[in-house]
Amino acid sequence: MSLKSISAIIGDLAKAQPDWPAISHETMSITRLELHQSTNRLARAYRGLGVQEGDFVTIALPNSIEFYQACIATWKLGATPQPISAKLPRVEQIAIVSLAEPALLVGSGADLALGVQTLPANFMPDPALSDADLPDKVSRFWKAPTSGGSTGRPKIIVSEIPGCFDFSQDKPLQQEFDRAQLVPGPLYHNGPFSFSMNGLFLGNHIVVMTRFDAEQTLALIEAHDIDWMMMVPTMMSRIWKLPDEIRLKYDLSSLRVMLHLAAPCPPWLKEKWIDWLGGDRIHELFGGTEGTGATWITGDEWLAHRGSVGKLLGGAKVKVVNEQGETLPDGEIGEIYLLPPGGQGSTYHYIGAESSGLDGGWESLGDMGYVDSQGYLYLSDRKTDMILAGGANIYPAEIEAAIDTHPLVRSSAVIGLPDDDLGQSVHAIVDAAEALTDEALLQHLTEHLARYKIPRTIERVQTPLRDDAGKTRRSALLKERIAQAKDIN
């Protein structure tokens, strides 16, 4: 078997088992044949609006069957889907659209004057358009997700992997053919997007949730005989905290792989899940959207190497260096650098940012840690100030930039305070005029930031938050507040 385009993969699945379910969402479901035919028609509608091979299509849709249809229609034209949150504020959406320069924007924001062709959510193509197969095309880049970036400005991470795959040789992340996969996370995030699309291409029945709900997740696993799913630790925590009479009443025997990623998992929580489901069913992945390298570890391995995130996959290399860029021996903590098999630039390129790293193409995800003598990687801390809240990457500079746009704000600093549920919660420290109330500031931020980025707590100060060099020492601010909390307790 050789590489096949995404269009051919979807078409072959439809021919093999046309009536099998492809995607389910809430009370709606679509078969493989319906998915293939509807996306042929939708692709023709997109083409009529000017989408061509090599273009980007920005997709601002919530979790839904429609989201998958928009992506597949884009691939069938040889274009690249560029997913974003359907709830992005106008300022953020304009910034991303200006970077991507898409041929088409689908979904939220279609009513804004963004200077690009747009389609609203729930768009239905003309039924007179043909649903026959289109000429086979391969997208040059199969995906282009976004990131806030440590500078506070958005960037687009364009995958260098083309839109064609050969799963006969390598099935990703222990996924199997013709199973069922649950998607509880937002599809504009790289993990849910990539892994659920891989599952779809493998013939999995994709069961996508509108939003995560702890008990509903368990009910869907039982109802659809879910084989594979991924979660972030916040989801795991909320499920574990359900009353036993709820958590234990559902049959989870079909669940073969539960993969967690995107944020550190508290050891106590991981142990509870291993005790509950078994170490052979709990898996962890560490890596970045850039695809420069990833690790994998099973629950059983983790018990033998407690705290590790596993060994490198797929021929990638890892090294740990000190501040001078010198490679450290096993067991010594430093900054973690990864090198993909094809070298720097082989897995992605940025729009809106520049890649950086060490000589030879080694790149860092901003994590500190060490490698043991057996090649297991351990994380100790973040080098940067990025906040990990509920599995989402949140960049303080972006929130500070939004806060500082208010005319009554003098300066601000944003840090991530420890949070039992989310891992970290966004805390804003603000030096502002007394006339500015917290309520007014929060209202201001709703116009500039996605909801999950808005601070959960605000602290008022009357001292400068930047040093003479104009830098904010967030790590020092965080240590002070953690120490204060310990003194109070």
Write out the residue ranges for each language-model feature:
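Conserved AMP-binding/adenylate-forming core of the ANL superfamily
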Residues: 2, 21-52, 56-64, 89-94
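Conserved pre-ATP/AMP-binding loop-to-beta segment of ANL
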Residues: 3, 18-19, 123-146, 153, ...
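Gly/Ser/Thr-rich phosphate-binding loop
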Residues: 145, 201, 227-228, 244-305, ...
